[in-house]
Amino acid sequence: MKAVVAWRLRGAGLVLFCALALLAGGASAAAPNDPTVERGRYLARAGDCVSCHTGPSNVPFAGGLPMATPFGTIVSSNITPDKAAGIGDYSEAEFARALREGVRRDGKRLYPAMPYPSFAKLSDADMHALYVYFQQGVAASAAKPPPTDLPWPFSMRWLMLGWNMLYLDKGPYQPDSARSAEWNRGAYLVQGLGHCGDCHTPRSLAGGVKAASERQGDSYLAGALLDGWLAQSLRHATRPGAAQWPRDDLVAYLQTGRTAHTAAFGPMSQVVQNSTQYLSREDLGAIATYLQSVGAPAGAPAPTVNPQAAVVAAAAQSPAASKLRAGTVEGAGAMVYLNNCNACHRSSGTGADTVFPALAGNSVINAKDPTSLIRIVLAGSAMPSTEQRPAALAMPGFGWRLTDDDVAGLLSFVRTSWGNQAGPVSPAQVAKVRKALPAAAPAPSPPGRSRP
């Protein structure tokens, strides 16, 4: 997802330091149901701190997760209250400075991989609750992850002084008096702890987001490539996307990772599983209200019908559906679909509600950039496991059996069938994504021109 200088992290988005938002001290256990600790736990989940600060050992917040960036590998730190290996010696002021200004207890600068420009928007009350939680509500771990060692000149942390002058706006979130309390709550969560813009907003050559809020221009939440995935635009776009879903669909998606027509995949699946499923329905509703407004025409009413629904309803009568049902398909791509995809996603491309995502009218299918779509076909993806929907349904990868030509033909067929209106995919695009796949998600080229 990069030739430009951008801070892009693996896994739900540049959260390398949501956890320094965790610079809490002390390893003593808090009293059961302590309201401040529980509030901090809720906020830490809203910030998805655990995703980046839990490594191969699977010890929460003990760090050790290697994250690839254009500048080298960053290893997440231990943010448990262990005094030697973690953040147990941080005072509340030091914790807040790390979270808001990107400065460690020893005075060294943090890399912008940690989204401290977003966390700077936190209120003092929320900052305090986070500190108390990481001081008293997290089990200490003595694990010592290897230090981050970026090559020169990126190893010179003092360079972040200049970066901060360009991209760090100090001060908490300032409510918009012209908007409702719910809208402002949603903006606070999206711009702050949720740091949605760190994945969904394109970056400049210096690695900073081009806009940190809707007030700073149309780049905000306009979509960006991140670690081999396309974080889609969350703005009111020409092609139907999340911002044009009804409120209930947005809430359901953030709560369970699936709706009647689509499902979370890639890093977003992790965000739902570790973060948004735990948010209150009121906060999820506030997020939906805010997102529906970003990029929307002035005075536009909130969407009440998912635009994908009409496409899905008409898909069964489409020419592609008729030919697939009859087995009279034309073209290699349609044949690949019939032999590999039809059983789950059906001849109509409508899938099955909350189980197999519909391909008809799907915003991922219709995206201008097919990177995510190619990656899903090559390496597969899984839905999140949540309290409401515990089954982590998964699609297997087909990279082991389909050639680049196969995948290109398949996706070109899918992107022009059942009412979809997207451009073709080339074998070169597939080859590029296949080559960039991480070792954890291999999709080797088939040994020959295999046909399923």
Could you say what each language-model-derived stretch is?
Residues M1-T36, N58, I74-S77, A98-D106, ...:
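Post-cleavage N-terminal segment of exported redox proteins
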Residues S51, N58-P60, A84-I87, R97, ...:
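Short loop/beta submotifs within extracellular cysteine-rich repeat domains
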